[in-house]
Amino acid sequence: MDLVTVEEPLEIWVAYEDKQGELTETSLSITMRTPGEDEALVTGFLFSEGIIRSLEDVTNISTFGPVTEPYSLQNQIKITLKSGERVAEKKFQRHFYSNSSCGVCGKASMAALEMLHLPAIDKTGFRIHDKTLRKLPSRLQESQAEFEKTGGLHGISLVSEDGEILLTKEDVGRHNAMDKLIGQLVLEQTLSANNEGVMKDKMVLVSGRASFELVQKSLVADIPFFSSIGAPSSAAIDLADKYGSTLVGFLKEKDYNIYHGAHRIFW
């Protein structure tokens, strides 16, 4: 029997205090995702958007809406920000429909992405050996349990300097997998914008290509090294260059391309 990846819409709502101190609920985004770990997905999404800075900004996360068949899912989720956390409403101007291949499609402007708080990337913290780097594609694939079943999911791993896969998330969309990874780190209180440097000795490895948005998300999470099995975009290369991160593409056992930040690799 052929197993198929499930893809369902998820509508993300945010409840927050407006400028008048009134509780406001707004629909922020609809994304096509692989169900499961929706709390991590929405937490990582809001962290990457600069709407929350840590788990302390959140009081509740809950799913709601009609139960849909045949998978018995609720496809709406609401994250409530803590009382007194008055969010600048301009942060909600970046409303968009997010499909499984392009999370950034429909953004108000590319410039809005660069307005996000991006920490200063550590210039010396992370270094990985060439031989270790070459082993990572096979380790990523081994860590993708759901991909083994369906062949239809992207994977993103958090990796240590010695090549250990610390965490892997999967989703039909690369940007969702990244949000799930970042979101779990926030939910575990490992990651917050108030704790810069905690990710300085980590890297991310993506099963597909390196897009502007994925590199941006890694920068918001203060991760200095981004590698991908596929090709990077020109905007991703420019972003890595601007903020000083390492960007590797076409990573395979036999070779790879370094687009920026070669000083974090040694032979």
What are these model-predicted stretches?
Residues 1-156, 160-161, 165-167:
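Intrinsically disordered, low-complexity regions enriched in acidic/Ser/Thr/Pro/Gln residues
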Residues 76-88, 168-177, 220-229:
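Short, Lys/Arg-enriched charge-dense amphipathic segments
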Residues 174-258, 264-267:
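Feature captures the catalytic cores and cofactor-binding loops of soluble hydro-lyases/lyases
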Residues 159-160, 259-261:
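Short beta-strand-to-turn element immediately C-terminal to the catalytic PLP-Schiff-base lysine
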